[in-house]
Amino acid sequence: MIGFALWPLVALASISPLQTSAASASTETLNYAAIAARIIDALKLREGERVLIRYDPEYFNELIGPLRRQIRARGAIDLGALEYVESAAIRDTTSAGEAKRAALFEAQSRAFAQLLEAVEVYLWLPLRAGWRELPAAESHALQRWLDQGGARRQIHFHWSAGSVLADGLAGEHVAAFDSVYQEALDIDYAALSTAQDRAITLLRSGTVRVRTPMGTDLSFRTGNRPFNKQNGEASPERAQVAVVRLDREIELPAGVLRVAPLEETVNGRIVIPTARFGDKVARQLKLEINRGRVVRLAADENLDAVEAALNTGGEAARRFRELGIGFNPRLHTTSHTALLPYYGYGAGVIRLSLGDNRELGGTVAGDFVRWFFFPDATVEVDGRILVREGKLVDGAR
């Protein structure tokens, strides 16, 4: 699709065998039937629920058939599988004038919203970055759809897109992570949820302090802010009692616990050894935070790139966003790569971030979000240790 025509939203294609591309060659040995079973089990589909799948025809195509068969076997309605939009088609619209782009955005959003009216469950399957993507207008429509409540819910199954470096930006996914991710789907989910519940109790009980060997020393309180448990449950019952939008967006592999602290209680500093900003790398980046706001920046190299990025991001870019703590015991890092598995969901990995946190129940609004990961942090609450140097302590597992 080129020019300014709408994406083919009604072309819910039947699946036919497609050749595996080089991008998916490393996934040839995966057990797609078992992966599909894990996804469907997480959903706890009710009879008659309507399911829409989004996919890249040249990446994880082997998963589509087993998914659709298992959807039907549960008595749910397989509405079909819709391809992600080609990135080149989206780029073709960037040369249009502002008014034309705005009109296209609204038209796309309305059309996709109409499609979603017939859906209870939306499945995000992996895609190849730079080749396929979800248009911003459709992402906007999905958010509004989720916010209508009820049993509406999504499974996010991003796979290679979750392979990130500690600066929060994507790294180059390695084949070894495919087996790591598959193993990380096969965990004790009840034990995971119990460990997250224990952590919530501790994190609510006092002042949280996060420290790293490189100099991060940040404290805050969570108060009565909602915690988002990525515990692998995407049932309609959970969706019905969702407190924040992220409670309806369930990630597989599972494992992270997320919260937006009370913004005015966040004080201290975050030290980031290296972070990419555009085509530059900032080194020894230090963020001084007072009452949830970044009040001072320093870096050994390329501070100008950091300043430019935060200025472009607006007010939200200088506001603290969230704490995330990983709990999945099988999303382990390796000595062979600096990559972190699946968005830092591995046990003991800490996420600190800046930007809009409304989807977590916070008060920071804007269009900016930037994550930073710390695989060697210590987290304590009034002296009681939850994570010590990147390892969950006994009793926190």
Language-model features, listed with the residues they occupy:
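Short, solvent-exposed amphipathic alpha-helical segments in soluble enzyme
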Residues: L67-A73, S139-H140, P226-F227, K286-E288, ...
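Active-site bordering "gate/hinge" segments
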Residues: I15, S21-N267, F277, E389, ...
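Structural beta-strand/beta-sheet cores of well-ordered domains, especially the beta-sheet scaffolds
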Residues: G206-V208, T216-L218, G255, V266-I270, ...
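Charged, compositionally biased interaction regions
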Residues: T27-A37, A190-L192, A199, L203-V208, ...
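Oxyanion-binding "anion nests"
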Residues: L252-A298
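Short acidic-glycine loop/turn motifs at beta-strand connectors
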Residues: M214-G215, N224, I289-R293, A298, ...
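Bacterial N-terminal signal peptides
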Residues: M1-P17
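Dual-mode signal for accessory low-complexity, basic/Gly-rich regions
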Residues: N267, K280, R296-T363
